[in-house]
């Protein structure tokens, strides 16, 4: 007997349809699994065998060959357990092969026949829809992701027996109801700009960075509020669109970081890796490339505190994602490109001791130490940071006041208005904010006659030279 069942796996952050071919023929009992399976897939043989027996379905004691096509793609994860089991039951005439057309099966099997949760289900459902499938069967624990994709029927199953009874028409399941992704987009943040005392210049700079999507570096002594301000940057960014929310949710589903309580990521990501992070953890890597912090921060904020403490080689890896909005990772087995459009928010002390220019403490560093500290950040990387501001210590009179600062919601309203103006202006060239403009867009849209502070050509040229405006 021969059967073909549709399954799904992941490659990078995208789903890939797999054709599971099962052949049961006469011969000594054996179970061969071919088609470049990873270790988790090879181990499915024992899980499938135990799940069938413990669900009261016979396991064929003959020669079994399972091929996972395309054979040149490495198959990762345990989500192919279910289609392999369905293929074996089809060969055993438990299921009718004609009723399995255009149906995709995703899930890991436990030894007692239950169907366990797998990572990356959202990407798999999206790929199944793109490939023309009509129905997808997923674990019950992945139901939240199944509600997000319209145009395809998604069923959840808890056990192998429940699936078989549905496919045989004995116990009909109903498809998951579809969910409007943005219906609950009223995010409640636990931090707010209203908590920040003083630092009016820094607050204004972060508002400009949020409005234009610009990267920013804050330099100041310890305790001046750099980290506090950075953690509130995400609260003034515009709400994510449906496409952005789905893209971020897909990434977090792949790496298994999707919050249990949420079906979709509505809050923009805020990632703050420690300065000891490796290059592969920051950009992504592994024998089969997986997303790193720059991809987990996609459509959000990547905060690098104590910037000079990071390894120089690690920081240099940020050049490509900051320039292109994506990161390419090449390995022997695969080459992947991951999205990485984020706002870089970095913070550092002005010197090794942290008190250069401080109004209270005296700096104890030698000039050579200060110069060496500043050289830890290369010129090419600094060129890619759009805004650099110096923060001073907040006066005690500002700290003791009970008056709250402007709330994040009020700042966010202005940011949203600014983004809408940019999107309207830049829609024709396919970009969304000022930070994404290239040389041609700057030449096309930048009208220097509107710069009122430049009342003469000489003053304008001197200003441009002073801020090191580059041709690229």
Would you name each region that the model predicts?
Residues 40-45, 58-60, 67-77, 289, ...:
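Basic, amphipathic alpha-helical bundle interface domains used for macromolecular binding and assembly
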Residues 299, 305-307, 317:
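Walker B catalytic acidic pair
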